[in-house]
């Protein structure tokens, strides 16, 4: 059993062998979670909605999501991107079903009442939390029902709040929670780089403790993946892998630990 997170920006640059490779992995059970932040930003701009990003004191950059942005986020992620991926899988004979975290109460989250950010002056500032959520539960029974019928769930990271509102949750961390809930053996983050780079060199392996230690020294995009990786390990996932999606057979190569970053104590 493997949970695969694919960054929305690399869907179009996946190697032609990627989908057939996912089909092979599906025999053992696959849940696919996708991102799509760049596409959301593009559509926001097309609709005249200026995207806003904030940075936490821990140097994590994220989208500030007001109600209108949450609606655009849902439209793009659960519509355009999700269905594009499902179509690609179906085209290669994979019985895939597209879901958002709203469907079947798949991902529940608690709406953040406030966010602490670092403002333009470099000072901490508390702002209204908007429509951003902290994941509280995953409906693993729904996923297991689909997996038991040989179906590949394709999940967009939109969560349902306590008041049934749409909430934006981080895709990497949503994948980590899904991996933990489904007792996945591993989680794979498919990206546009070979893995974690330090001093221009690929880090091939890290223990969970080493990953926690170096996380503050990593750039914002990769830092989120390392954070999600360590969270997945704490939830019982055996290993987390960060690998490039544009290489041949990216899933099989990552599982074989070829030219990627593996995080875990195994």
Curated annotation (Swiss-Prot):
Q: Which Pfam families match?
A: AA_kinase
For substrate, which residues are the binding ones? 36-37, 63, 168
Q: Would you name any one GO CC term? A: cytoplasm
UniProt keyword ATP-binding, yes or no: yes
Q: For this protein, what is the EC number?
A: 2.7.2.17, 2.7.2.19
Cell compartment(s), UniProt: Cytoplasm
Pathway the protein contributes to: Amino-acid biosynthesis; L-lysine biosynthesis via AAA pathway; L-lysine from L-alpha-aminoadipate (Thermus route): step 2/5; Amino-acid biosynthesis; L-arginine biosynthesis
| Site for Transition state stabilizer, residues | 5, 225
Main localization of the protein described in the UniProt heading: cytoplasm
Annotated keywords: Amino-acid biosynthesis, Arginine biosynthesis, ATP-binding, Cytoplasm, Kinase, Lysine biosynthesis, Nucleotide-binding, Transferase
Query: What is the similarity comment for this entry?
Result: Belongs to the acetylglutamate kinase family. LysZ subfamily.
What PANTHER family has UniProt attached to this entry? N-ACETYLGLUTAMATE SYNTHASE, N-ACETYLGLUTAMATE SYNTHASE, MITOCHONDRIAL
Q: What does this protein do?
A: Involved in both the arginine and lysine biosynthetic pathways. Phosphorylates the LysW-bound precursors glutamate (for arginine biosynthesis), respectively alpha-aminoadipate (for lysine biosynthesis).
User: What HAMAP family does UniProt report for this protein, alphabetically?
Assistant: LysZ
- List the protein's name: Putative [LysW]-aminoadipate/[LysW]-glutamate kinase
The record lists the organism as Cenarchaeum symbiosum (strain A)
